[in-house]
């Protein structure tokens, strides 16, 4: 009987706790500068997951302060 109550308790918690990703939010990449793919390129970093479980990649912003002179 305790096992049955435990199973029902776990099931009720699973259905009452909201999912990690909201169904209301948009699962697409936000603009044309972002791309959904399975692996980001070397000059990109991952931002979020897309709807098909690929990764939304964005170009890295690399700032060069100038060349060091020795």
From Swiss-Prot:
> Which tissues and organs express this gene's product?
Highly expressed in testis. Is moderately expressed in the prostate and small intestine.
**Keyword RNA-binding, does the record have it?**
no
Q: Which residues, if any, are the signal sequence?
A: 1-22
Q: List the disulfide bonds.
A: 29-56, 36-50, 40-57
Keywords, A to Z, come to: Antibiotic, Antimicrobial, Defensin, Disulfide bond, Secreted, Signal
The principal localisation class reads: secreted
Q: Which InterPro entries match?
A: Beta_defensin_dom
Question: What superkingdom heads the lineage?
Answer: Eukaryota
Induction profile? Up-regulated upon stimulation with lipoteichoic acid.
One Pfam family for this entry, by name?
Defensin_beta_2
The answer on whether this UniProt entry bears the keyword Signal reads: yes
User: One GO cellular component from the entry?
Assistant: extracellular space
Q: Where in the cell is it found?
A: Secreted
Q: Which family does it belong to?
A: Belongs to the beta-defensin family.
Spell out the protein name for this chain: Beta-defensin 131A
| Organism, scientific name | Homo sapiens
